[in-house]
Amino acid sequence: STHVVVWATVDKSLGRAAIKSFVVPRDAPGLSVARLEHKLGIKASDTAALLLEDCRIPKDNLLGTAEVNVEKGFAGVMQTFDNTRPLVAGMAIGVARAALEELRSILVDAGVEVSYETPAYNQHAAAAEFLRLEADWEAAHLLALRAAWMADNKEPNSLQASMSKAKAGRSAVDITLKAVELAGTYGYS
């Protein structure tokens, strides 16, 4: 990227209450990448530890007003997280859905029928496990939709946003690992 967004306090005596967002050019003097994280997923977006040492940014790079509102300083940062956590959840939910769809195809090809009419305990063990995974996916999906809906409608959603991100991540890991296990050698295609 050519720019990064940095949250920093504009008044050390006020601490986090004076946090503001700034756009910082990557080539700004004093900005360097201390460490680039090596991730397994979301490679289109780098995650890095940035070091700002005597990095001075013009006032024009400030996002929002220059006025320090002690009541809203840190709350603005948290609102950004509350708005983006459902998006992160959505990425995990998409990965999990793709794994479920591929698993369903593999099970069908193997002659395992998944039925929504028959109780899980009367089905093949792989079909019963698929139904459990699908229920887990549905719970994560609905929680993320709720958190996103609340954000869209300007309702406080800190709890739901945090829960949706946590639930979706755990569900995606559980679903993808179990899909690999149930698919056997096809799970590594």
Residue positions per predicted region:
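Alpha-helical interface subdomain recognition
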Residues: L51, Q79-S189
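Glycine-anchored helix-breaking recognition loops at helix->coil/strand junctions
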Residues: L36-L40, A66-E67, V108
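Solvent-exposed alpha-helices and their adjacent loops that cap or buttress functional pockets
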Residues: K12-R16, L40-A44, N69-E71
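Short clusters of hydrophobic/aromatic residues that line enzyme substrate/ligand-binding pockets
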Residues: L31-V33, L40-I42, L62-L63, V77, ...
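A short core secondary-structure module
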Residues: S1-V33
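Long, acidic (Asp/Glu-rich), low-complexity accessory segments flanking structured domains
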Residues: E53-A75
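Flexible, small-/acidic-enriched active-site or ligand-binding loops
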Residues: D27-R56
